[in-house]
């Protein structure tokens, strides 16, 4: 499960910041927090990974918004507020469970839509159109001009149902 979690961290950050490098950096941060099994400040993480504190904070705050890292707030002896970050098995379980729940909901909606109507798809750009939309557009994709193809719903529903069953086991 740790590998799946690290993949989610890497891809989420890479997508948000439009930078595969940031994604790899976020993966290193999460991996280090998990392996050390202790709460660390953002300054300490930056020093251990030899990266800037600003980058570390940006990554950690984004991961916090996605509930991919845990954060604890405490007051120091000199009354400063200090945040410490951690990753444990519970965080990983919640992160993967949340992603699986979202995927299940979307797949269920897609299965429901496929059972309720007929669909056509463009072979080039893979846009999906309902029967009414395909008729209104004359059976031609408005994006690329290719002829729309009928989607065999039963086959697609079976594939999606198998994926849904696997996700429900998580």
UniProtKB/Swiss-Prot annotation:
Chain ranges of the HTH TFE/IIEalpha-type domain: 1-93
Single Gene Ontology BP annotation: transcription initiation at RNA polymerase II promoter
The protein's assembly and partners: Monomer. Interaction with RNA polymerase subunits RpoF and RpoE is necessary for Tfe stimulatory transcription activity. Able to interact with Tbp and RNA polymerase in the absence of DNA promoter. Interacts both with the preinitiation and elongation complexes.
Entry note about domains: The winged helix domain is involved in binding to DNA in the preinitiation complex.
Encoding gene, per UniProt annotation: tfe
Keywords from the UniProt entry: DNA-binding, Transcription, Transcription regulation
Protein task: Transcription factor that plays a role in the activation of archaeal genes transcribed by RNA polymerase. Facilitates transcription initiation by enhancing TATA-box recognition by TATA-box-binding protein (Tbp), and transcription factor B (Tfb) and RNA polymerase recruitment. Not absolutely required for transcription in vitro, but particularly important in cases where Tbp or Tfb function is not optimal. It dynamically alters the nucleic acid-binding properties of RNA polymerases by stabilizing the initiation complex and destabilizing elongation complexes.
Name the record gives this protein: Transcription factor E
Lineage: Archaea, Thermoproteota, Thermoprotei, Thermoproteales, Thermoproteaceae
SUPFAM superfamilies for this protein: Winged helix' DNA-binding domain
GO MF, any single term: DNA binding
Domain of life of the source: Archaea
Organism of origin: Pyrobaculum aerophilum (strain ATCC 51768 / DSM 7523 / JCM 9630 / CIP 104966 / NBRC 100827 / IM2)
Residue ranges the record marks as coiled coil: none
Family: Belongs to the TFE family.
